[in-house]
Amino acid sequence: MKLRTKAKALRGRLRVPGDKSISHRAVIFGAIAEGQTVIHGLLRGQDVLATIQAFRDLGVTIYESADSLIIEGRGFKGLKPAQKPLDMGNSGTSMRLLAGLLAAQDFSVQLFGDDSLSRRPMDRITIPLSLMGAELSGQGEKELPPLIVKGCQGLRPIHYQLPVASAQVKSAILLAALQTQGETVILEKELTRNHTEEMIEQFGGKLSVAGKQISIKGPQRLQGQTLQIPGDLSSAAFWLAAGLIVPGSDLVLENVGINPTRTGLLEVIEKMGGQLSYQAVDKDIQTATLKVSYSTLKGIEISGDLIPRLIDELPVIALLATQAQGTTYIRDAQELRVKETDRIQAVTDVLGQMGADIQATEDGMVIRGKTPLHGAAVSTCGDHRIGMMTAIAALLVEEGQVTLERAEAILTSYPDFFKDLERLWHD
């Protein structure tokens, strides 16, 4: 695919699609709650569609209305054995959260995915779930997919310290614990996104959170709800970056989720000197309208407990760093190596081929700016965030063409990405 280059300015207002993390969880909790759940603003990207289809295969009635998704919840005990293996597509969230949920059922199921997902480690969930008494088996030492889950209704509670900062692992344990007699305690290494904890309470469940410790007693019953999904900050990140680095740009992004466990990017933008302002802040539903303008940026260090709060935004932050004066250091981000692709290597390869002064390290990157970018032939590596980062980088290119292979990966989380780019384009 040939990407747009030589952007003069991006201007306008935009509503980004619904939050991917929250959309997954809304579907999951709607399916296991009792009664009807109505979801407005759901992301209809390929990852979330994989979660929806999985629950249909598990006997849950899910249908669309004009502007919402309606789920006829079956409760924890109402799921039915799937007649075939469940296809998770490219979605690590789907596989890990469903593994936790299905570990406590009374039937077995196989979860599989595409080539990218089949290279992602599942031992991080099989270890704690096995300690609870579940039987899960993958391929090799890292328990790579396909993953066989042999349900066990007699799971036992555990006290577990997460070895990695992972909301997916935490969520898998919580979904199993909701069906387990007794109290399960999870101690996080670093605070991670808390959408699962919030949704448990939203659906009438109970848990307690004290700093990095989460305690939950099971079994519990959940009740169907009506939900409004906020816009995805991880999708908004690409437009925020474009507004900051394309000269003459001025963008307003409406209804963006600003859950504090996800707003590391906004803090980084401010530290780099970006012109960012908040409008129409709604603290109850944690959304805001964000306004950005072209800015002179400076290099900074990004590390420590900030990393889990912006892990998905690090590719586009690396792009920002190529246009910042000075050196940016990204550290403690080794988790990037086990995403849809090795994002440290992919970001370094793509931006390096386009002329950036960027170096991969074991746990991050070193980027020296400011550098002009030029045309190149690159690939998404099957990773939606690499694809969108490249499309924004291409806007700065004045010489040569940028061609992007496997651009369809962007459909994973942002089906209308290129349509929205055209809406904001100003000659």
Swiss-Prot record:
Keywords: Amino-acid biosynthesis, Aromatic amino acid biosynthesis, Cytoplasm, Transferase. GO terms for biological process: amino acid biosynthetic process; aromatic amino acid family biosynthetic process; chorismate biosynthetic process. It holds the Pfam family EPSP_synthase. One of its GO terms (molecular function) is 3-phosphoshikimate 1-carboxyvinyltransferase activity. It comes from the Bacteria. It is an enzyme of class 2 (transferase). PROSITE patterns: EPSP_SYNTHASE_1 (PS00104), EPSP_SYNTHASE_2 (PS00885). 3-phosphoshikimate binds at K20, S21, R25, S166, Q168, D312, K339. The keyword Hydrolase does not apply. Pathway: Metabolic intermediate biosynthesis; chorismate biosynthesis; chorismate from D-erythrose 4-phosphate and phosphoenolpyruvate: step 6/7. Its EC number is 2.5.1.19. The active site is at D312. Phosphoenolpyruvate binds at K20, G92, R120, Q168, R343, R385. GO terms for cellular component: cytoplasm. SUPFAM superfamilies: EPT/RTPC-like. Catalyzes the transfer of the enolpyruvyl moiety of phosphoenolpyruvate (PEP) to the 5-hydroxyl of shikimate-3-phosphate (S3P) to produce enolpyruvyl shikimate-3-phosphate and inorganic phosphate. Belongs to the EPSP synthase family. Monomer. This is 3-phosphoshikimate 1-carboxyvinyltransferase. It comes from Streptococcus equi subsp. zooepidemicus (strain MGCS10565).
